[in-house]
Amino acid sequence: MNIYLLRHGTTDYNTQHRYQGQRDIPLSTAGRQALCRADFDPDVVFVSPMTRARQTAHILFPDAEQVVVPGLREMDFGTFEGRNYVEMENDPDYRAWVASNCESACPDGERKDDFCDRSCAVFAKLVDDALAAGRRQLVILAHGGTQMSVMERFALPRKEYHDWLGPNAGGYLLETDPETWAKDHTMRCLAKVQYTKDAMAKREAGC
């Protein structure tokens, strides 16, 4: 079974390097205009409930049914949301969080390990259900944090968490099968993908 694990398009918060987390930030005008229809047409896309993910799914896969999965929402960055690292460089809570390698709980937010466990449990259930139904394709559109959590835990070859951050409006094409998934819950990374007009034009040009 092929699995597409994708990230939403660009928002103003992305451009401004702000933590958006569970704030329901829409795509920016430039982010929407950059997107294009994907080169395949799934019948269903499993999406985060966040507006930016649903907007992206609608443009990439206009004919697909969107199934909202609450557990796919981004990490809750608590009081850090809406701000960027420059604005928080003298914030003692932020400095302590960075000093912990971003492993401690965000004030009024989530701990990274808890977020990863949540994301991976939801992802594994979607894979289990798709394989049980005999599906040949699973499409998930969520967030950068979702990608990094899932890829670090399940993807081959092995890489560190932050090494798996995919591009906006893109991510990874993966492959697994019932035997491999049942044995060790792994999937093979086949390609990095992106569904923007520029990326698709380069692909068509053979770049």
Annotate each predicted stretch with a short phrase.
Residues F40-G71, A96, E152, E175-C207:
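Conserved histidine-centered catalytic loops in small-molecule metabolism enzymes
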